[in-house]
Regions:
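Conserved PLP-anchoring active-site segment centered on the Schiff-base-forming lysine
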Residues: 111-129, 147-148
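Short acidic/histidine-rich motifs immediately flanking catalytic phosphotransfer sites
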Residues: 159-166
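Conserved N-terminal alpha-helix of the aminotransferase class I/II PLP-enzyme fold
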Residues: 58-107, 111-112, 128-137
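Short, Lys/Arg-enriched N-terminal segments with co-localized hydrophobic residues
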Residues: 13-28
Length: 191
């Protein structure tokens, strides 16, 4: 037999949409719990506690051009949505984004910049990042400075009013140099 508190809780759960329950309890979760359950919302269709892996390619629509939240798995699906929520929960952020690769994430970030903007990056970064910066994004009038980020002075000397991004990859690839992220963040905010 359920206690009054348990009955009250069950009644409240039925009244409050799952997204709000998630918001209420996520702040009390510890890191390991957030990593696993932070993005979970009870499945309204089947009641699954953990999000299943959705492997469908397309979703049924109510009518042409009026989807119910998802259209194609290549753009988004419930599995990825909950993963992004879990990442946001771990980071205590409102939103999280997942990409198919690191270069896809870099591409999305760099595309928020405008012609004439300058980016300071480590001179020892992943070759794919370097080629993306030099061969693709310099064509869009972005200016990249590649410096030794282990020396904060070399970064500080280059920062100017056009600097919009300090790109840090640490540990670096291939040399495995470690950039002091805290000091780099302080330097960026100072300027």
């Amino acid at each position: 037999k359920l206690s009054n508190k348990e009955n009250d809780f069950k009644r409240i759960i039925k009244l409050i949409p799952n997204i709000f329950i998630f918001a209420l309890i996520k702040k009390k979760m510890k890191f390991n719990t957030k990593a696993i359950h932070g993005g979970q919302i009870l499945d309204p269709a089947y009641g699954s506690v953990m999000t299943p892996i959705y492997q469908t390619s397309t979703y049924a629509q109510s009518s042409p051009g009026k989807h119910k939240g998802y259209e194609y798995s290549r753009t988004h699906n419930p599995t990825r949505t909950n993963f992004e929520r879990a990442i946001a929960s771990i980071e205590n952020a409102e939103y999280g984004l997942a990409f198919a690769s690191g270069l896809a994430a870099i591409d999305a970030i760099i595309k928020t910049l405008s012609p004439g903007d300058e980016i300071i990056s480590t001179n020892d970064l992943y070759g794919g990042s370097y080629r993306l910066f030099k061969q693709i994004f310099e064509k869009y009038e972005l200016k990249f400075h590649f410096v030794n980020m282990e020396d904060l002075t070399s970064v500080e000397e280059i920062i100017n009013s056009n600097t919009k991004l300090i790109w840090v990859e640490t540990p670096t690839n291939p040399m495995m140099n470690v950039v002091d992220i805290k000091s780099m963040s302080f330097l960026a905010k100072k300027k």
